Protein backbone atom coordinates (compact mmCIF):
# COMPACT_ATOMS: atom_id res chain seq x y z
CA UNK A 1 0.00 0.00 0.00
CA UNK A 2 1.29 3.43 -0.91
CA UNK A 3 1.98 5.77 2.00
CA UNK A 4 -0.41 8.38 0.56
CA UNK A 5 -3.21 5.82 0.86
CA UNK A 6 -2.24 5.12 4.47
CA UNK A 7 -2.32 8.85 5.14
CA UNK A 8 -5.65 9.22 3.34
CA UNK A 9 -4.29 11.68 0.77
CA UNK A 10 -6.31 12.30 -2.39
CA UNK A 11 -3.93 13.34 -5.16
CA UNK A 12 -6.66 15.39 -6.84
CA UNK A 13 -7.04 17.49 -3.68
CA UNK A 14 -3.33 18.36 -3.32
CA UNK A 15 -2.64 21.93 -4.45
CA UNK A 16 0.84 21.62 -5.94
CA UNK A 17 3.33 19.01 -7.14
CA UNK A 18 7.04 19.38 -7.83
CA UNK A 19 8.09 16.29 -9.74
CA UNK A 20 11.84 15.94 -10.01
CA UNK A 21 12.99 14.66 -13.36
CA UNK A 22 16.20 14.15 -15.26
CA UNK A 23 14.24 13.89 -18.51
CA UNK A 24 11.08 15.81 -19.50
CA UNK A 25 9.27 12.60 -20.40
CA UNK A 26 9.40 11.48 -16.74
CA UNK A 27 7.37 14.41 -15.44
CA UNK A 28 4.90 14.02 -18.30
CA UNK A 29 4.45 10.29 -17.69
CA UNK A 30 4.00 10.71 -13.93
CA UNK A 31 1.46 13.50 -14.43
CA UNK A 32 -0.43 11.46 -17.01
CA UNK A 33 -0.35 8.14 -15.15
CA UNK A 34 -1.44 9.65 -11.82
CA UNK A 35 -4.08 11.83 -13.48
CA UNK A 36 -2.64 15.06 -12.05
CA UNK A 37 -3.88 18.46 -13.15
CA UNK A 38 -1.12 19.96 -15.35
CA UNK A 39 -1.82 23.38 -13.81
CA UNK A 40 -0.58 21.98 -10.47
CA UNK A 41 2.60 20.23 -11.66
CA UNK A 42 6.03 21.92 -11.80
CA UNK A 43 4.39 25.32 -12.08
CA UNK A 44 7.74 27.14 -12.05
CA UNK A 45 9.69 24.40 -13.83
CA UNK A 46 11.00 21.16 -12.40
CA UNK A 47 14.47 19.76 -11.88
CA UNK A 48 15.49 20.28 -15.50
CA UNK A 49 14.76 24.02 -15.27
CA UNK A 50 17.41 24.36 -12.54
CA UNK A 51 19.95 22.18 -14.33
CA UNK A 52 19.15 19.00 -12.34
CA UNK A 53 22.10 19.52 -9.96
CA UNK A 54 22.98 16.14 -8.42
CA UNK A 55 22.53 16.17 -4.66
CA UNK A 56 20.69 19.49 -4.59
CA UNK A 57 17.56 19.17 -6.71
CA UNK A 58 15.40 17.70 -3.93
CA UNK A 59 16.12 20.44 -1.43
CA UNK A 60 15.74 23.15 -4.08
CA UNK A 61 12.30 21.84 -5.08
CA UNK A 62 11.29 21.47 -1.42
CA UNK A 63 12.24 25.09 -0.71
CA UNK A 64 10.34 26.24 -3.83
CA UNK A 65 7.24 24.48 -2.47
CA UNK A 66 7.65 25.96 1.00
CA UNK A 67 7.91 29.49 -0.41
CA UNK A 68 4.89 28.91 -2.66
CA UNK A 69 2.83 27.69 0.31
CA UNK A 70 3.89 30.77 2.28
CA UNK A 71 3.20 33.17 -0.58
CA UNK A 72 -0.21 31.85 -1.67
CA UNK A 73 -3.41 30.40 -0.28
CA UNK A 74 -2.34 26.87 -1.29
CA UNK A 75 -2.62 24.48 1.65
CA UNK A 76 -0.43 21.53 0.65
CA UNK A 77 2.12 20.21 -1.82
CA UNK A 78 4.01 17.07 -2.74
CA UNK A 79 7.61 16.88 -3.93
CA UNK A 80 9.30 13.89 -5.55
CA UNK A 81 13.05 13.52 -5.35
CA UNK A 82 15.55 11.19 -6.95
CA UNK A 83 18.07 9.66 -4.59
CA UNK A 84 20.38 8.08 -7.14
CA UNK A 85 20.44 4.77 -8.94
CA UNK A 86 16.82 4.96 -10.07
CA UNK A 87 15.45 5.23 -6.54
CA UNK A 88 13.06 7.90 -5.39
CA UNK A 89 11.29 9.38 -2.40
CA UNK A 90 8.57 11.94 -1.94
CA UNK A 91 7.68 14.47 0.74
CA UNK A 92 4.27 15.88 1.58
CA UNK A 93 4.04 19.42 2.95
CA UNK A 94 1.01 21.02 4.53
CA UNK A 95 0.50 24.33 6.28
CA UNK A 96 -1.70 25.08 9.25
Walk through the language-model features, giving the residues of each.
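Claisen-condensing/thiolase-fold acyl-transfer catalytic domains that form or cleave C-C bonds
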Residues: 3-96
